[in-house]
Amino acid sequence: MLLPLFHQQPLILAKTFPDRIFPPFLVPNTLVSRRNVSRANSGIFCSSASGRKTLPQSAIQRIAEKLRSLGFVEEKHDSPTRRITGEESGKNSPGEIFVPLPKQLPIHRVGHTIDTSWSTPSYPVPKPGSGTAISRYHELKRVWKKETEMERKKEEKVPSLAELTLPPAELRRLRTVGIRLTKKLKIGKAGITEGIVNGIHERWRTTEVVKIFCEDISRMNMKRTHDVLETKTGGLVIWRSGSKILLYRGVNYQYPYFVSDRDLAHEAASGASSMDQGVVDSREKQSIAESSAPSITNKMVKPMLTQGVGSPDKVRFQLPGEVQLVEEADRLLEGLGPRFTDWWAYDPLPVDGDLLPAVVPDYRRPFRLLPYGVSPKLTDDEMTTIRRLGRPLPCHFALGRNRNLQGLAVAIVKLWEKCELAKIAVKRGVQNTNSELMAEELKWLTGGTLISRDKDFIVLYRGKDFLPSAVSSAIEERRRQTMIMENSSVHGNKLTENEEEIKPRAVKEDIELEAKDQKDHIQTHQMKSRQRNSPEAILEKTSMKLSMALEKKANAEKVLADLENRESPQLSDIDKEGITNDEKYMLRKIGLKMKPFLLLGRRGVFDGTIENMHLHWKYRELVKIICNEYSIEAAHKVAEILEAESGGILVAVEMVSKGYAIIVYRGKNYERPQCLRPQTLLSKREALKRSVEAQRRKSLKLHVLKLSNNIEELNRQLVEDSATNETWSDGESSNMMVEEETENQHTEPEKAREKIELGYSSDLSVPSSGEENWEDDSEGEVDPLTTSSQEYQEDESESASSQRHEGNSLDSTANLSVFAETGSANASSFHDRSLPHNSFLNANRKLPGSSTGSGSQISALRERKSENDGLVTDLSNRERLILRKQALKMKKRPPFAVGRSNVVTGLARTLKMHFQKNPLAIVNVKGRANGTSVQEVIAKLKEETGALLVSQEPSKVILYRGWGAEEEMKSFYPNNNVKSSINLPSTRSFVDDPPHVSPALIEAIRLECGL
């Protein structure tokens, strides 16, 4: 079937086109109708209004025209007609995808894409890479490369032992063989042990090169590992890179191990290799025979054999390098003591610790001094590293006893001057050896650090603060000289003969000059310290602190005032939406159950708080805000501010476990404002600044109050010191008067007795009629005292009357003058054990010639008055029951207990501090000493604390301070009728009734108001 022209499939075009794309035989003229041509011609002239170009007649022609515009050139052939061969038809067959090769794609460099049409001779476009900067860069780079190569050539690498002994070709061959090896030998934490050496020799029996991989401590110093491998094995390191080593066995290598038994026929018959059979030569047999034969030299010199691994009879001769290592280890032990001859391990022989002296006269622990900035303890990494270093070390000492190791301690300290670690082996076969006791004894005697300990070995580290004996002795000598010169300069004494002998003669004059300068320095230092510690200096310093605190407080108040001026909170809207009580009840109930809430922190209310409220109101009608205020009134103030600024309706302010919950309703006609953050409130940063400044002002107020109290106390102390100095000068004259009175007492004892007993005549005789009125006046002061207090005073009066006849007249005169000054009010409540009860009555009388005592005596007597003031009474059974219930309901009980020693001084001090905040205390008496009754412990506690016994349980007692439980006890009494006996803080407490407002706050208010 023939298709029209526009239905024919186009051919795959090559890059070049012939002159005529469509041969005349492909398109028959009979099939082209005029109708189609006219339609085609009409389609040809259709074009856009802007172009007005004549389009090609077909799509193929348009594609060809596009390819010509892209740079493809047509190939011109001589023959007008060309037949397509089979190859070309195969290449350009219909349906084949044309994939261009890289050679067929045009290469466009970046430099050649620049349009050169605007280039002129005066301003030519530079070629890519021909600029001055890039040319200079390439030139400098070439110079740098040449210099680097020259330096590399100048550095002559030191050749290794393998490079010096082996030819280069053989060395390259061995390195190639070693690098291709897949099996490798790992050197672990223990280092190059005999097992590693044995493994290397076993591999050398089959291969001439062994690849070794170092780990842990061995890789930290590869040069050291390199040398140790060559020393212990006798091989050559032919290549080393990182932690890998290629070890060559050598040219004339022989397997070094042999069996120490004389009968070698069994080994020969066991089918060993020829190499193994040729190892044991005549020289080795002779050495074995000589070592086994008994001789004097063999007893003195041990054969240099090293036991192998895997068989007890397998040994080898030590290499020269190994002998050198043993000699170095043996050199460390020279001069430390006798050797342990029955040593079972490798050389060198350790020192026998049992042969060292058990007790060294005048032994002292070594002096230590830690460098500045160094931590005394070892870190975990340091401990691990030192422990790993101590494992391959040879043993320095062998020990079999547990105690009396002073001689061994001296030897260890000497060893520490050469080696940081000391390794002690525990002797085998010795009875009752305990490595733990040994380690503790040595650690205490030497002051070192225990690194590791087991049943066989003990490793001790000398520590970071270790000093050699020469350095420590020099430091101790210098300190001793300094102490001697300080003592001589302070006390002004001359040095003794022994101390003179201590000082070296060469530096005697220098020490004297230094001592003189030090004496002057000490005197000036003492003078300055006295001036600093004087009350005047302390008062001046405190005044300066007070002025600085006041200045800081003023600055804080100024900043707070500025922040308050910036904030202008809005007033609540008068005409706002209201809600009914039922709605408020339901909203409150829903709000308290809400899980999402806003937390109000230390910043308080600021613009971000209101923004968060509006964001909450976007999804819910209520918002719950938690604030940590101290009172419900403060929470209500915060709620009012939130209500006014947000425009919501305050529902409730309730107390919850986290603080106070403020619930705000957005309202039924809520509209979200355009600006969520109100401009009348502070920002987040300003709110934090306000909180910090308020806290600073509060702390400065208390600091100012404390400093002002200190200044008042210092002023009072200065006045008392001046008064004491005056009374001290008057005391000398009074002592003269006392001496005269004592002389008169010898001559006129009866008159002196009458003068002494002037104030106590009421105790010995019945009062006369002239004294009845005075007794009636004083009767009102004696009546309030209870019966127990009267008995106490009678006992005291008896003891005082017995001392009165033996006392001095001056003491009685001073006591009378003191009581004359204090007055009757203080005398009624003052119970001094040094005076009888009736002396208070006589003290109220105005005695002629009575002089007032000094201020220090009055203050001392007042302190004794405060100690003995307030004799407590017992509680009723009902009060005890109520207080017991209240004590047992306490949730947080402080752990008070009486110990085995029955000393209650510290417990009483703690109870007094506890009673300042809590009215009740529970004391556990179960742990008291055996044979001590509970009543005795209770009596001690009551005497020390002044508390009341509420209840005595089987293992505990309940104490009451005497006041503070009235509010709680009201719930137990009907009609809130609390007995008057509970409300007697003046007679039942050893501490004043605490006010509702703290004293510090009251003093701060007084200071602020200028009162």
Curated annotation (Swiss-Prot):
GO terms for biological process: Group I intron splicing; Group II intron splicing; mRNA processing. GO terms for molecular function: mRNA binding. Residues 77-90, 743-757 have a biased composition (Basic and acidic residues). It holds the Pfam family CRS1_YhbY. Residues 1-45 form a transit peptide. InterPro entries: CRS1/CFM2/CFM3, RNA-binding_CRM, YhbY-like_sf. Its main location: plastid. Residues 77-96, 721-810, 841-872 are annotated as: Disordered. Keywords: Chloroplast, mRNA processing, mRNA splicing, Plastid, Repeat, Ribonucleoprotein, RNA-binding, Transit peptide. Residues 772-782 have a biased composition (Acidic residues). It is found in: Plastid, Chloroplast stroma. Residues 722-736, 762-771, 849-859 have a biased composition (Polar residues). One of its GO terms (cellular component) is chloroplast. Disruption phenotype: Albino seeds that germinate poorly and die soon after germination. It comes from the Eukaryota. Residues 164-260, 376-473, 577-677, 873-972 form the CRM domain. Binds specific group II introns in chloroplasts and facilitates their splicing. Acts on both subgroup IIA and subgroup IIB introns. The substrates of the subgroup IIB also require the CRM domain proteins CAF1 or CAF2, with a simultaneous binding of CFM2 and CAF1 or CAF2. Can bind to and promote the splicing of the single group I intron in chloroplast tRNA transcript of trnL-UAA gene. Interacts with RNA. Part of large ribonucleo-protein particles that contain CAF1 and/or CAF2. This is CRM-domain containing factor CFM2, chloroplastic.
